[in-house]
């Protein structure tokens, strides 16, 4: 399969649908643009060196591709005069390829694929095997040289490693001079790309081939997919038959004639969702007829194109970090993103899971993160890919300031937790007030009608009808809904205002009896340990909670009298 990963990045041309540069360009002053472009370029150069010189992949290939696309976009947005980086500058070896390795155009979407197919004939399709590219040189049928792709013109000598790999024939049936180009891949059993992704298969092969020696067991785990025979027959069918006669069965088994876009989409979907012996990251479209090998160059030609699988991971830019504080005081950082597509979903927000994880990752606006879908539906933060050159200052809430007994009023800094308390109070696990949700509370708070958790109990029609968004009818409907709270039983009210979990404890319908229990008395109840007993005692003794009980007593709510 044509090597369309980092082993040939300098020869890749990204065919993108109408970029609309103006709408995608960041709103940066010149100095910031220069520093951000330089920082991303340096990060990519570090990845390139690690991969090509050390055989270590620090980043998934699809994220690398997206990072390069972003770098190219930024350069075009700001005309930054940083020197163009060569991703293969550390991959060049001493051995010249007898025939250069060409690159491949990457087609971004359905329209690009249809455009490439239009007007062409003698078309074929293959899976785009996720491996590392190699040239195999045979003289009189005997393997004499194996060369890494390098920069497409020169590569490293892999001959000693190739001698150990059983998938590479040491002697061909025909005693002829033969040049083959193909992909060395990590063997997998019934690998389904859509379910398992690339499982770092290509990096395993790259890492082994970067070593001086590999064990027989490691060598046996490497397979070969021959995707071209530069000095073979001009006709594609004849080339495939010849490769099959040489013993390269996979080339014929996985290469099929192609007539139209529908067939291309069908094969792409089939190879994405059905078992294969190797990882893939798309399909290769190629014309059967191509120029003589003497005319090949280490650049993307017109007769080959790649159509990649949907991204399993997307590169997303963080626009803002919001700190969502729940009713119990738990702080959850939520990242606002420049929207990205994953499968058929648009992802614009993602949670870091916890404040501790956010602190560990230290994600700031401008950082580039990796996002995937957990279970194919839920956006998941996989990690930081690169950081903004300028680290944004942020106001970060202190974990010690928020807990089960904080933020009973809409005071500065308490907005998030207080609103979460109200949402819980009116929700299904609280008072279950019909038609009352976060939007209702936000409107009432923003218009100064609610400052404390139970202020809504004293609202009247005259106060509501003058609030924007509350007409005569909606005001009456809201008051009717709020009125139903008075009918709720005592224990429902306890949960609604934030009672900690009580296990199997007895809960008499009397506030004063519960408030009078000591830690030891709580601990004597079923399912109550020392920690929970202390929490329950603290809840009932908290001055803010006691003030709530007095308000409910004044409103003649059952159990609080």
Curated annotation (Swiss-Prot):
Write out the catalysed reaction: NAD(+) + (deoxyribonucleotide)n-3'-hydroxyl + 5'-phospho-(deoxyribonucleotide)m = (deoxyribonucleotide)n+m + AMP + beta-nicotinamide D-nucleotide
Question: Which residue positions are annotated as catalytic?
Answer: 128 (n6-amp-lysine intermediate)
* Keywords of the record: DNA damage, DNA repair, DNA replication, Ligase, NAD
Q: Is-annotated flag, keyword Ligase?
A: yes
One GO BP annotation is: DNA replication
What Enzyme Commission number does this protein have? 6.5.1.2
Instruction: Tell me the Pfam families matching this sequence.
Output: DNA_ligase_aden, DNA_ligase_OB
Write down the top EC class of this protein.
Answer: ligase
One GO MF term: DNA ligase (NAD+) activity
Question: Which branch of life, at top level?
Answer: Bacteria
Main function: Catalyzes the formation of phosphodiester linkages between 5'-phosphoryl and 3'-hydroxyl groups in double-stranded DNA using NAD as a coenzyme and as the energy source for the reaction.
Q: Which NCBIfam families match?
A: PRK08097.1 (NF005987)
Q: Which family does it belong to?
A: Belongs to the NAD-dependent DNA ligase family. LigB subfamily.
This protein is called DNA ligase B
* Organism this protein belongs to: Pseudomonas syringae pv. syringae (strain B728a)
